[in-house]
Amino acid sequence: MPSFDIVSEVDLQEARNAVDNASREVESRFDFRNVEASFELNDASKTIKVLSESDFQVNQLLDILRAKLLKRGIEGSSLDVPENIVHSGKTWFVEAKLKQGIESATQKKIVKMIKDSKLKVQAQIQGDEIRVTGKSRDDLQAVMAMVRGSDLGQPFQFKNFRD
């Protein structure tokens, strides 16, 4: 029986490349001359620390980062940015978290959405991913289109498509 897995992963190497590109752009931009502004990617905690001298500049840096992530194939919705910007001394910063894996509440929404669609497929939660199996390849592709079209707050990838 054909099957595939629904996952939500961010390629850390591509994220590192996007952070490096954003840092290079900030160094060359006129509005960031003589300003302490930087990006730091922490691989262990999968966070990107955006640091600057004012909260307005932090928001500008976040826009630059989102644009660079999008160019590297990482959707902006995979970046979880908290609302409040932390002020410490003369710097402002925010720690944006890269979303890895699908949360259990989102997994349950996806499984319920698949079951409500009345397609002849089964969905099982397996750790951070969802395995979808069915008899017809067309039904599986319909599930893929339905999950892509849903607005659940994070991007999804489809892996291990087996016939």
UniProtKB/Swiss-Prot annotation:
Gene Ontology CC terms, in alphabetical order: cytosol
SUPFAM superfamilies: YajQ-like
A molecular function GO annotation: nucleotide binding
Entry keywords, A to Z: Nucleotide-binding
Xref: CDD domains: YajQ_like
Organism domain of life: Bacteria
InterPro entries (UniProt xref): DUF520, UPF0234-like_C, UPF0234_N, YajQ-like_sf
One Pfam family here: DUF520
Biological role: Nucleotide-binding protein.
Family as reported in the entry's similarity comment: Belongs to the YajQ family.
Full protein name: Nucleotide-binding protein YajQ
Species this chain originates from: Escherichia coli O81 (strain ED1a)
